[in-house]
């Protein structure tokens, strides 16, 4: 028994603090949350499907309004969950991207189809990255 304890002690001390930090992070990070994942999935799905509507200014404006609303909801939801700064930061990034698209439709009566598609692709990639981070949390 003493040999096992000594081996564990040496293994954790010889490999540096990295092991201790990984154990600490795994133990104290926020756990998987269905609501976080669902809201992120909504942003990703809507941004993917909304690309088809980029020719229609009215539909695109409504889509960006919806994306902005869901992103703000996600950001607010993640804000006070303990040990959850990564998800909150990713949600903040989604808010900024959706806000940029929303503001463009508010300011300009005609927004190019290219802008719409590129912005929705950015939102989709960002939501996918957030989904990977949120989905990989311990259960």
Please tell me what each predicted stretch does.
Residues 33, 97-139:
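C-terminal amphipathic alpha-helix
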């Amino acid at each position: 028994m003493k040999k096992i304890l000594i081996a564990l002690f040496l293994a954790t001390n010889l490999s540096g603090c990295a092991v201790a930090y990984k154990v600490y992070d795994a133990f104290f990070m926020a756990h998987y949350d269905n609501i976080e994942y669902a809201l992120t999935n909504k942003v990703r799905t809507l941004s993917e499907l909304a690309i088809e509507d980029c020719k229609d200014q009215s539909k695109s404006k409504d889509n960006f309004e919806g994306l902005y609303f869901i992103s703000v909801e996600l950001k607010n939801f993640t804000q006070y969950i303990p040990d959850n700064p990564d998800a909150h930061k990713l949600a903040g990034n989604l808010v900024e991207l959706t806000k940029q698209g929303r503001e463009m439709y508010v300011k300009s009566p005609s927004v190019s189809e290219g802008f719409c598609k590129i912005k929705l692709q950015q939102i989709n990639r960002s939501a996918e990255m957030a989904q990977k981070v949120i989905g990989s949390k311990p259960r």
